[in-house]
Amino acid sequence: MKQSHFFAHLSRMKLINRWPLMRNVRTENVSEHSLQVAMVAHALAAIKNRKFGGQLNAERIALLAMYHDASEVLTGDLPTPVKYFNSQIAQEYKAIEKIAQQKLVDMAPDELHDIFAPLIDENAWSKEEQAIVKQADALCAYLKCLEELSAGNNEFRLAKTRLEKTLELRRSQEMDYFMAVFVPSFHLSLDEISQDSPL
């Protein structure tokens, strides 16, 4: 059997720190970010299905979200101000991401390509799946800002404002529900969110 470096590369997601140009109270890596995005994307899809007549496969969306930044094991996490400095850089970075996604898929054993390619290659996702994962990605970045700000780190003040605009652009009924039901707790302390717990 031929050796594959696929999972050895994926395991390096935990070594890639997000928000590299900003001072962080707590550093966040791509691996933990991907898990949070997967949980939030799954919730958004489930909310859409349960409350707003959606027909999404919430489990598939959780998987897509788990892999949404996987290509960063080859490209690193380019800071947002650099990535979107102008339209040409944004376009070139998208092309680099596409190459990295394909290179990552090519590392998987041939007999598993058809399993991993549709998870890693965003072109294989439906528009609705892409939208949900993008909403979850922006929501998780916003939640990171709330956590940093609540810890007294004003470095994330402008990032929060920018992300509020992004969330407004990606707004949906399921996102409004998530924001109303789940996000307020992120402004509270551990004691405050544990008050009603019988433990």
Curated annotation (Swiss-Prot):
<dbReference type="InterPro" id="IPR022971">
    <property type="entry name" value="YfbR"/>
</dbReference>
<keyword id="KW-0963">Cytoplasm</keyword>
<dbReference type="Pfam" id="PF12917">
    <property type="entry name" value="YfbR-like"/>
</dbReference>
<keyword id="KW-0378">Hydrolase</keyword>
<dbReference type="GO" id="GO:0000166">
    <property type="term" value="F:nucleotide binding"/>
</dbReference>
<comment type="subunit">
    <text>Homodimer.</text>
</comment>
<feature type="binding site">
    <location>
        <position position="33"/>
    </location>
    <ligand>
        <name>substrate</name>
    </ligand>
</feature>
<dbReference type="InterPro" id="IPR039356">
    <property type="entry name" value="YfbR/HDDC2"/>
</dbReference>
<feature type="binding site">
    <location>
        <begin position="77"/>
        <end position="80"/>
    </location>
    <ligand>
        <name>substrate</name>
    </ligand>
</feature>
<feature type="binding site">
    <location>
        <position position="33"/>
    </location>
    <ligand>
        <name>a divalent metal cation</name>
    </ligand>
</feature>
<keyword id="KW-0547">Nucleotide-binding</keyword>
<dbReference type="InterPro" id="IPR003607">
    <property type="entry name" value="HD/PDEase_dom"/>
</dbReference>
<keyword id="KW-0479">Metal-binding</keyword>
<comment type="function">
    <text>Catalyzes the strictly specific dephosphorylation of 2'-deoxyribonucleoside 5'-monophosphates.</text>
</comment>
<feature type="domain" description="HD">
    <location>
        <begin position="30"/>
        <end position="142"/>
    </location>
</feature>
<dbReference type="GO" id="GO:0046872">
    <property type="term" value="F:metal ion binding"/>
</dbReference>
<feature type="binding site">
    <location>
        <position position="68"/>
    </location>
    <ligand>
        <name>a divalent metal cation</name>
    </ligand>
</feature>
<feature type="binding site">
    <location>
        <position position="137"/>
    </location>
    <ligand>
        <name>a divalent metal cation</name>
    </ligand>
</feature>
<feature type="site" description="Appears to be important in orienting the phosphate for catalysis">
    <location>
        <position position="18"/>
    </location>
</feature>
<protein>
    <recommendedName>
        <fullName>5'-deoxynucleotidase YfbR</fullName>
        <ecNumber>3.1.3.89</ecNumber>
    </recommendedName>
</protein>
<feature type="binding site">
    <location>
        <position position="137"/>
    </location>
    <ligand>
        <name>substrate</name>
    </ligand>
</feature>
<feature type="binding site">
    <location>
        <begin position="18"/>
        <end position="19"/>
    </location>
    <ligand>
        <name>substrate</name>
    </ligand>
</feature>
<feature type="binding site">
    <location>
        <position position="69"/>
    </location>
    <ligand>
        <name>a divalent metal cation</name>
    </ligand>
</feature>
<comment type="similarity">
    <text>Belongs to the 5DNU family.</text>
</comment>
<dbReference type="InterPro" id="IPR006674">
    <property type="entry name" value="HD_domain"/>
</dbReference>
<feature type="binding site">
    <location>
        <position position="69"/>
    </location>
    <ligand>
        <name>substrate</name>
    </ligand>
</feature>
<dbReference type="GO" id="GO:0005737">
    <property type="term" value="C:cytoplasm"/>
</dbReference>
<dbReference type="GO" id="GO:0002953">
    <property type="term" value="F:5'-deoxynucleotidase activity"/>
</dbReference>
